[in-house]
A protein has these predicted regions:
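Acyl-donor-binding surface of acyltransferase catalytic domains
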Residues: 1-18
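Conserved beta-strand in the GNAT
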Residues: 70, 75-92
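A short helix-loop-beta-strand connector motif used in the catalytic cores of GNAT acetyltransferases and
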Residues: 58-70, 87
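A short beta-loop-alpha structural element at the N-terminal edge
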Residues: 20-34
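Conserved beta-strand-loop-alpha-helix junction that forms the acyl-donor binding cleft
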Residues: 121-131, 147-156
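Conserved acetyl-CoA pyrophosphate-binding loop and the N-cap/start of the following alpha-helix
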Residues: 97, 101-109
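Conserved active-site alpha-helix within GNAT-family acetyltransferase domains
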Residues: 1, 104, 126-144
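Conserved GNAT-fold acetyl-CoA-binding loop/helix
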Residues: 37-59
Length: 157
């Protein structure tokens, strides 16, 4: 069991981003898979979520990838984010570019590109670094959700 915070964008920030993001393209599929799995590996391992490497095969890429945007330099993915209606999801930064401000820039890009009054995201309590980023950029915890991964996962199937 672990906790997930629902956070809402309640305190708008005036910061703007200068980065440009592009829609996901299949030419980045293998690199995205590697970066995504690496970004979530430690958390999924600590929370005992199986499989630890979430993207196992190409079936992951069959849905919702039209909502994923990449920040690319040259041919390398620096980071990405998924925008689902009014929700920011799967904001990741390539490990070699972490702690350089790219997470904030990707978050600001997402905020500028969501056309909704209410913007939310969900983050595991374990992910202190992400929670701090979100708080510094106008998000506040509005709900705490308890996840029993094994039970909830079985109920979904």
């Amino acid at each position: 069991m672990f906790l997930v915070y629902e956070m809402e964008y309640l305190h708008p920030v005036n910061d703007k981003t200068s980065i440009q993001m592009i829609p996901f393209s299949s030419k980045y599929q293998e690199e995205y898979k590697r970066i995504y799995n690496k970004c979530y590996h430690e958390m999924r391992q600590a929370l005992k979520i199986e499989p630890v490497d979430y993207i196992q095969d190409d079936s992951f890429f069959e849905s919702c990838m039209d909502k994923v945007f990449l920040f690319v330099s040259g041919e390398e993915i620096i980071g990405s984010v998924k925008i689902k209606d009014n929700e920011i999801d799967d904001l990741i930064v390539n490990a070699k570019y972490q702690s350089q401000g790219y997470g904030k820039q990707i978050l600001l890009w997402a905020l500028e590109n969501i056309k909704s009054e209410k913007i939310i995201l969900h983050v595991a309590e374990w992910n202190k670094k992400a929670i701090e980023l979100y708080r510094k950029n106008g998000f506040e915890i509005v709900n705490t959700i308890s996840i029993n991964y094994e039970q909830d996962y079985k109920e979904v199937q």
